[in-house]
Amino acid sequence: MATKIRLARAGAKKKPFYQVVVADERCKRDGRFIENVGTYDPNQNPAVFKLEEGKTLEWLGKGAQPTDTVKQILKKAGIWEKFVSKLA
């Protein structure tokens, strides 16, 4: 089972709010997911994100692939650098 770390949309019309989730890549964007690892609110200025670092690093270690947008969020949070340094 190939897993992705991606954004699942929530919130009202014209006011998106996203959950950062780990899901099977075959599932729908807002469908079934394995685990919720954080949130992302682009409506705030600057955009606010909260990630559970331990869970995120665990799933990256298991081979979950982040989408491009989630990878940028992980870089801003400093989690991506920690993951890359563990690999080296």
Curated annotation (Swiss-Prot):
GO terms for molecular function: structural constituent of ribosome. Keywords: Ribonucleoprotein, Ribosomal protein. The keyword Ribosomal protein applies. SUPFAM superfamilies: Ribosomal protein S16 (SSF54565). The keyword DNA-binding does not apply. Gene3D superfamilies: 3.30.1320.10. GO terms for biological process: translation. It comes from the Bacteria. Pfam families: Ribosomal_S16. One of its GO terms (cellular component) is cytoplasm. HAMAP family: Ribosomal_bS16. Belongs to the bacterial ribosomal protein bS16 family. This is Small ribosomal subunit protein bS16. It comes from Geotalea daltonii (strain DSM 22248 / JCM 15807 / FRC-32). The lineage of its organism: Bacteria, Pseudomonadati, Thermodesulfobacteriota, Desulfuromonadia, Geobacterales. The gene is rpsP.
